[in-house]
Amino acid sequence: SHGLSDDELEIMLNKARETGLLNKAFFYVWDEPTKTNEYEQIKTLSDRIHRYAPEAKVLTTFYCGPTDGEHKDDLFAVFDILNGATSIYCTGVWALQDNENRSKQCKAKLKSGQEWWSYVCMSNTPGLASNSTAIGNRATMWRNYKEQNSGFLYWVVNGFASVYPLRPRPELPEGDGILIYPGESFGTNKICTSVRLERWRDGAEDYDMLVLYEKKLGRSAALSLLNNVYKSPSNYTDQSKYALALRKNLIENITE
């Protein structure tokens, strides 16, 4: 159940609205539901929030359809089951099965005011764990641009089992949930970023520049340019020179 009383929840939501934060926030009430009763609990939690703030956005992450009930194994049924309770549907890329048509199906299920996001975790490729190459880290956002997600979620950036001594969680793939490191282990009092995070940043910058390129020359032209380095989640360049050429081309066309 929610940790706040009704009065506390109402006060928090009113304060968020008054300070202009409510339209920037989303409520993450459940992680990766798989069963019918879990969807019902999401509806209950969402109803409680919407009682005091009908405009509040609730985000739900999921990587599969229900594992029970009449919609068993139907990924796209989640959009119908949670209609009204969720405004941001965030699918794990594992559920998309390297099939861009499934991304199109997700977008087609959206109703007015709803958004479709995606997330990577575990050993997804392209992704952010250590099994992805540096270009794979970058291609995470190339994929987002091509498949037209309106948001990207990553579950945690400092998911250590312990900090003293510094240890990752043994049940997770190497690098999953760890994008930054405490500086003490590396002789500094500042946070240290991973190379994987820096390459993801490059991809996020590419994404922003592709959007600017699209506004100037059209989406078809932007996709044609992206196609030089990225065709699908299982078919993208492994040569950094082509990634750099993409960046150079984007900058030249945006600024001329």
List each model region and its residues.
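Catalytic-core regions of glycoside hydrolase
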Residues: 1-163
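Catalytic domains of carbohydrate-active enzymes that cleave complex glycans
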Residues: 1-2, 7-38, 42, 46-65, ...
